[in-house]
Amino acid sequence: VAGLWEETDESLIGPLVDLLYNDPSEEVRTAAAEALGAYVLAGELDEIDPAQAMRVEEALLSVLHSEGEPLSVQCRALESIAYSGESGVRQLIDDGYYSPYEEMRVSALVAMARSADIRWREAAAAELISPDPAMRAAAARACGELEHRDALPDLFDLLADEEKEVRLAVLFALGRLGGKDAIEILTAAATSEDEEEAAAAEEALEESLFYQNSEI
């Protein structure tokens, strides 16, 4: 199941939904919930049959509304359903954000980013100072995805974060947000002795130039 994230072959919807509902392995069900996200997005873009898209969304919603479901399955289901434009999804994201479980709160930030709903900008920015590095990283990516340019000063500060996952997320966000200061920082970061961070900065620079050219 892993590796099917970018796959949108409609013939796989039935098997994936069946795995989500019935597989005895939590790991497999979690992977199925994640893989179905591509179909939700494809449905929003009118790239698959509407009835099939609805089938996918109903399966994910069923998992989210079912008590006793493993947390990891519900987290991936929330991230996947976030691509949907259905009005009830916003409440699901909000519920996830206020969950007592850290993993679900992180997934809520991922979902905010995928929703492309700018109403989540302030919530995402507020988590840039979270004591939890996974939350800071997810928040940074969300600020980038939601094009929250007002968050740039806080993102610049996070480049000194002690956690690499946070710094990498910030580099991604700067690539999405662009601007003179961001490009200067990314250019400098591309010469980092840390190969992973240098590669992330180079990729972010390319991303920044792509978005800049697409706006011309």
Label the predicted regions.
Residues 2, 18, 34, 75-79, ...:
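Residue-level signature of alpha-solenoid helical repeat scaffolds
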Residues 2-5, 37, 82, 113, ...:
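Structural signature of alpha-helical solenoid repeat scaffolds
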Residues 9-21, 42-66, 86-98, 117-129, ...:
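Amphipathic alpha-helical scaffolding segments comprising HEAT/armadillo-like alpha-solenoid repeats
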Residues 10, 25-27, 69-72, 102-103, ...:
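Alpha-helix N-cap/helix-start positions at coil->helix boundaries
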Residues 14, 30, 58, 71-75, ...:
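Alpha-solenoid HEAT/ARM repeat scaffold
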Residues 36-41, 208-210:
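Hydrophobic residues within the alpha-helices of tandem HEAT/HEAT-like
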Residues 49, 63-89, 102, 106:
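Solenoidal tandem-repeat scaffolds enriched in leucines and small polar residues
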Residues 199-216:
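Terminal, low-structured helical/coil segments at or just beyond the last alpha-helical repeat
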